[in-house]
């Protein structure tokens, strides 16, 4: 082991021992980035971009049976107040610039969930001349939720996967 590797492992050991001592006294030792990610996962605000029948399932997720707000996710009507955009339904060539414009209005960090076969890859209308073959050609997508239409449980699982992804990745990089 080189001196550089030894110094790094000693530092980790010192941090772990200090963390154990502080936990016994009721304190928490963490990084600012972990704290920010923890807060961000518990307060995601999603904006709907419902274009077709998948939007109905998106509404079911907000209803009392599934109650997505218990996970800290709440709907917002304005892109300037939202962190997550859920694209649900068939995206046409005519609607693509509007999707990009709304995405650009969202503050950083912003996340996109593509919901349903039509948003993921064009779906049933894949070979139509006027359909975009996946919203990932217009905006970067973080989570894909498959199905036609996907169930509310599938969307809920996708939201939980997004929260896990936010916890795993840093605040600077996406």
From Swiss-Prot:
Which note does the record give on the cofactor? Binds 1 [4Fe-4S] cluster.
Q: Which residues cross the membrane?
A: none
Look up the EC number in the record and give it. Answer: 7.1.1.-
What general EC class does the enzyme of this chain belong to?
translocase
Q: Which Pfam families match?
A: Oxidored_q6
Which GO-annotated molecular functions does the record name?
A: 4 iron, 4 sulfur cluster binding; iron ion binding; NADH dehydrogenase (ubiquinone) activity; NADH:ubiquinone reductase (non-electrogenic) activity; quinone binding
HAMAP family tied to this protein: NDH1_NuoB
Please state what the protein is called. Answer: NADH-quinone oxidoreductase subunit B 1
Species of origin: Cereibacter sphaeroides (strain KD131 / KCTC 12085) (Rhodobacter sphaeroides)
